[in-house]
Amino acid sequence: MPEEAETFAFQAEIAQLMSLIINTFYSNKEIFLRELISNASDALDKIRYESLTDPSKLDSGKELYIKLIPNKTAGTLTIIDTGIGMTKSDLVNNLGTIAKSGTKAFMEALQAGADISMIGQFGVGFYSAYLIADRVTVTSKNNDDEQYVWESSAGGSFTVKADNSEPLGRGTKIVLYIKEDQTDYLEESKIKEIVNKHSQFIGYPIKLLVEKEREKEVSDDEADDEKKDDEAKKDMDTDEPKIEDVGEDEDADKKDKDGKKKKTIKEKYTEDEELNKTKPIWTRNPDDISQEEYGEFYKSLTNDWEDHLCVKHFSVEGQLEFRALLFIPRRTPFDLFENQKKRNNIKLYVRRVFIMDNCEDLIPEYLNFIKGVVDSEDLPLNISREMLQQNKVLKVIRKNLVKKTMELIEELTEDKENYKKFYEQFSKNLKLGVHEDSNNRAKLADFLRFHTSASGDDFCSLSDYVSRMKENQKHVYFITGESKDQVSNSAFVERVKARGFEVVYMTEPIDEYVIQHLKEYKGKQLVSVTKEGLELPEDEAEKKKREEDKAKFEGLCKLMKSILDSKVEKVVVSNRLVDSPCCIVTSQFGWSANMERIMKAQALRDTATMGYMAGKKQLEINPDHPIVEALRQKADADKNDKAVKDLVILLFETSLLSSGFSLDSPQVHASRIYRMIKLGLGIDEDEPMTTEDAHSGGDAPGLVEDTEDASHMEEVD
């Protein structure tokens, strides 16, 4: 008695995705075949890999292939592979109840106008079958389980049951019941066209069951018998030859040895035709391969719907032999920096035999956007993942891949337009490389691009910056911050720009990590204009003026330090300000204001490190600013004047904000500003507040008159 089918509901996101696929019009439905062939190829890769360590895995079927069977009579297209197959739990989980991470991301991309052909990149390619089929059955046999069949007409549920029909041995058979308006996908010519376009570089034979004709000589009696048999079978789907009378031979009197007349008839028969006889592209001479061929191979390898940006095809010979084909895609994948995501961008082959596609030791993490193939002559076929980690050959391959990738990016820099596209997508990867890869740091630094105070809207390289440096300029000056507008208007760049020195604007959070490791470039030290100890080239007159200013404002600096106490490490006369009265700088080895902001946003930040790294601040005052000069005169007249204390605190808090820091008590600072606005508008301090104000108890600290308020201001950071 046959086992009853179990019914399962599709996971909500998968049901949504299927509904989207079925109910939306897509013009390029043909990608369904690419996706199903790609999945079949993956299944074949898995069984071949398992068989390297356990050859008995192939006892259930030695031949590894993909077969396509169109049946116009039944209206079905069948895709068979002799891959690893699926167990019952695989069928339930992989085809419906567990959504992959890409399901939601793909739906969002689709709704945002992305192409349906992107589906394979998100790991949900199987569901593209419903572009052309209204019902799908998947029969599968894994070595570790019985044969089961999965079936769904996409109505929100699917069934799985044991299958006692024709045994597969091992592998998967997908039957697509083609929609009435999609029957052109049953035509041989259409299938050949799609396979040639999308899947010609699959590493296993793709066989298509085709119908052919041949002429055959038979006697009249045999012809009559075969004709009758053929008529009897004409409605049945069969591989038996079909007979068609093509008239008698030219020699009507020609007879066989029994004296019977002979006829030539046309016989129809079916046979497998291999569609992808092209040998692996990476084994061919690069000079013989067109850009179109590289493009087709890239798409079949990655399921990308766009062409690659550039390609590097090379071979290494000598003590170690391997061939490789490396591609840079046009855009970043949606999950590029997901830590838990297994990378499968570079497929590792040994002597044309696929070994694995998620070998983490093949290329460093910061280059995880590179896609391609590596085919080694020296690795053992049955190498395990554990053995790979210790393998010296792999380390040499990795070193060569990194070197060739650097060459590829360097070649790309010569094409400004394409490099701009590349940099917009992958600049974070290059910067991560500067942070992580000390051996290639100098080379990666050449690839970085930034806005500067002299570059306008264009990006420029550090090499361009160095070539424009003034004769008396010793350092590369830079500033980090949130945006180009913010840093270009910062108080820190005033004097540097006024002196004609160019400043590099670093406005991405990752730049803070880059400069921790990129201390110099081409012998020029990188100097932050927001850190203490900024030295600008100066002549004797400027030196003399600076010494005079130091002496003149020494008393004010000491007074300000005593008022601000532990809030600052010291107060000094600045050599970097022009228009601003003061600014807050950090110590050489502490965090900049921008880094402090980034670290405060970290959910898992270390508060002990925060206190240590963010603790040291220095207040710099501008000796040429009228506010500072007036404050000095007021302090010299009476250093105990409460107004001086109030103004010092107000200046300090305002400079914290303008220097990119945040206030611990913004409300107290705001209250002081409101009090100043009141004074500016001539509103009497003693004027009674409205009822709401009285209830809120919103008593703001005074600025000048109220002694108690003034001392309160002194205590608040």
From Swiss-Prot:
SMART domains given for it? HATPase_c (SM00387)
Keywords in alphabetical order: ATP-binding, Chaperone, Cytoplasm, Nucleotide-binding, Stress response
Gene Ontology MF annotations: ATP binding; ATP hydrolysis activity; ATP-dependent protein folding chaperone; unfolded protein binding
Where it sits in the cell: the answer is:
Cytoplasm
Q: Does the keyword NAD apply?
A: no
Stretches the record annotates as Disordered: 213-263, 687-717
In which broad location class does this protein mainly occur, judging by the first location in its UniProt entry? cytoplasm
**Which one Pfam family would you cite for this protein?**
HSP90
Q: Give start-end positions of Basic and acidic residues composition bias.
A: 225-245
Give the location of motif TPR repeat-binding in residue numbers.
713-717
Does Secreted appear among the keywords?
no
**What job does the chain carry out?**
Molecular chaperone that promotes the maturation, structural maintenance and proper regulation of specific target proteins involved for instance in cell cycle control and signal transduction. Undergoes a functional cycle that is linked to its ATPase activity. This cycle probably induces conformational changes in the client proteins, thereby causing their activation. Interacts dynamically with various co-chaperones that modulate its substrate recognition, ATPase cycle and chaperone function. Required for piRNA biogenesis by facilitating loading of piRNAs into PIWI proteins.
* Alphabetized NCBIfam families for the sequence: PRK05218.1 (NF003555)
HAMAP family given in the database record: HSP90
Q: What's the record's remark on domains?
A: The TPR repeat-binding motif mediates interaction with TPR repeat-containing proteins.
**Family assignment from sequence similarity:** Belongs to the heat shock protein 90 family.
Its subunit composition reads:
Homodimer. Interacts with shu.
The name of this protein is: Heat shock protein 83
Encoded by which gene? Hsp83
